[in-house]
Amino acid sequence: GFGCPFNQGACHRHCRSIRRRGGYCAGLFKQTCTCYR
């Protein structure tokens, strides 16, 4: 979701928009957008 697995930048922007420091694509096939604080 949120751009993953192909557009990690979209995931990162989504995470920034919910006041996280950023995000990356995680999981077996990089299909999950994971935010970090």
Swiss-Prot record:
It is found in: Secreted. GO terms for cellular component: extracellular region. GO terms for biological process: defense response to bacterium. Keywords: Antibiotic, Antimicrobial, Defensin, Disulfide bond, Secreted. It comes from the Eukaryota. InterPro entries: Defensin_invertebrate/fungal, Scorpion_toxin-like_sf. Disulfide bonds join 4-25, 11-33, 15-35. Has the structural arrangement of an alpha-helix connected to a beta-sheet by disulfide bonds (CSalpha/beta). Belongs to the invertebrate defensin family. Type 2 subfamily. Dual-function peptide with antimicrobial and potassium channel-blocking activities. Shows inhibitory activity against Gram-positive bacteria. Does not act on bacteria by disrupting membranes. Also moderately inhibits Kv1.1/KCNA1, Kv1.2/KCNA2, and Kv1.3/KCNA3 potassium channels. Inhibits potassium channels by interacting with the pore region. Does not show hemolytic activity. This is 4 kDa defensin. It comes from Androctonus australis. The lineage of its organism: Eukaryota, Metazoa, Ecdysozoa, Arthropoda, Chelicerata.
